[in-house]
A protein has these predicted regions:
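Membrane-interface segments at or immediately adjacent to transmembrane helices
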Residues: 159-228
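Membrane-embedded alpha-helical segments of integral membrane proteins
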Residues: 61-124
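Transmembrane alpha-helices and immediately adjacent membrane-cytoplasm interface residues
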Residues: 115-116, 134-168
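Short, positively charged and aromatic/hydrophobic N-terminal segments
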Residues: 5-8, 17, 25-34
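Auxiliary, metal-adjacent structural segments of Zn-dependent hydrolase domains
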Residues: 202-272, 276
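Pan-zinc metallopeptidase signature
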Residues: 349-409
Length: 409
């Protein structure tokens, strides 16, 4: 048989037999050789970049925060008319497409995922006896990468905004030390306003104020009230959705939380289990956070302004009650007798609402509420609200400044 013909036949048979496998070639002297792929270099060429680059989000977050704290003008630009407005409006419009709180669903999903991955990690640590160090290292790396992403998103969503110009400076209010007489006059004025608004409101079977409107309608009123402020305060941008109800509101009450701005979905979430007279002011408070004002005392003050400007009597009453509680607490610290005298002059309806509110929160007193307050206190201090939870009382300085401005001819 011709040798070349023999090699060709053998080659054809070999290729049919090894169809789908690595290609073959004729080597020297017609010897059939199988091409072997070199895996090392190929893997290196196709290797996808790992997740280590996510760790760079830590220094990026710290750098942005440091820049904002060093230059309030940068923070004001970012929050008022810069990237924050575009980012928050875009995400808020998407999350506003659903009637439920996307934030609440995300938190529930996150907790479920955390439990799942924690259990999976524990199982792998038991099974991989010889590779426990590598398994633990990979788990911790993934955890660090996730935390870096969340920190960076938090920085963009609200962290920078904590360092913007104070609201008093932006709106032209002069905050200064006030006398006890001024504080007493403020409390009496707010008490009169609350009495006047309370007279025409609906009440429940226990003669306690009730809204008389469902949540969607109340939420739309809050949205319009905040939007209306843009005419007087252009830096309070409109164009955001309405607040969302929290399904597990009772759980929030156990943590002493009436509402929550969730920075990862740009939603204003409201506890619906609380006394009705607090809900409108809470809605406006959380919507203020959504508009870039993160300091609590400023969000309270803007909430008061929005409620007062609202055409709803229930909203005006809620705003008056919010302001009165803080002002009367400040007066009580300065002069308990004067505070008692103001409280004694309140109408029966207002006193009944205040008593109902106190009774509601009293049932949640305990370790959970204490821990929640402690966590909130540390969070506020970490974001340069040095007085922590006590900084809520600084709203009174803004109220006094507004009172002086309105009395000036």
């Amino acid at each position: 048989m011709n040798s070349s013909y023999h090699v060709s036949v053998c080659t054809a048979r070999f290729q049919r037999k090894n169809r789908g496998s690595a290609p073959v070639r004729l080597g020297p002297y017609g010897i059939i050789e199988k091409t072997v792929k070199k895996r090392g270099p190929a893997l290196k060429e196709n290797k996808k970049p790992g997740r280590l680059w996510l760790l760079a989000l830590y220094p990026a977050s710290f750098a942005l925060t440091a820049l904002a704290r060093a230059d309030a003008g940068f923070a004001e630009w970012y929050a008022a008319g810069g990237p924050y407005t575009a980012l928050s409006r875009t995400v808020n419009r998407l999350t506003s497409l659903t009637p439920f709180s996307v934030a609440e669903a995300a938190v529930c999903a996150f907790l479920a995922a955390a439990v799942f991955f924690a259990l999976r990690f524990a199982v792998r640590m038991v099974r991989r006896k010889g590779r426990r160090a590598a398994t633990a290292g990979r788990f911790l790396l993934n955890l660090a990468c996730l935390a870096g992403v969340l920190l960076f998103l938090f920085t963009l969503a609200c962290g920078i905004n904590y360092s913007r110009y104070p609201f008093a400076r932006t709106c032209g209010l002069k905050v200064q030390p006030s006398s006890k007489a001024e504080l007493t006059a403020l409390c009496r004025s707010l008490a009169d306003d609350a009495d006047r608004q309370r007279a025409g409101l609906k009440t429940d079977a226990h003669s306690v104020m009730e809204l008389g409107t469902d949540f969607p309608q109340t939420a739309r009123t809050a949205q319009k009230a905040l939007d209306a402020l843009e005419a007087d305060y252009p830096f309070l941008r409109s164009g955001y959705g309405a607040p969302k109800p929290v399904f597990f509101s009772r759980a929030l009450s156990r943590c002493n939380v009436t509402g929550m701005f969730f920075p990862f979905t740009f939603e204003a979430n409201v506890n619906t289990d609380v006394p009705d007279y607090t809900i409108p002011a809470t809605m406006c408070h959380e919507l203020t956070h959504l508009r870039g004002y993160m300091r609590e005392e400023e969000a309270n003050f803007v909430s008061y302004l929005a409620c007062r400007k609202s055409g709803s009597r229930a909203f005006r009453y809620s705003g008056d009650m919010l302001a009165f509680v803080y002002a009367s607490n400040a007066l009580y610290s300065a002069d308990a007798g004067a505070a008692d005298a103001v409280l004694a002059g309140l109408s029966v309806g207002v006193r009944r609402d205040l008593a109902a509110g106190s009774a509601y929160w009293r049932q949640f007193a305990g370790p959970v509420a204490d821990v929640s307050e402690s966590v909130n206190d540390r969070y506020l201090k970490a974001n340069r609200q040095s007085e922590g939870v006590k900084s809520y009382g600084r709203m009174v300085d803004l109220l006094l400044a507004l009172q002086r401005k309105e009395k000036t001819p």
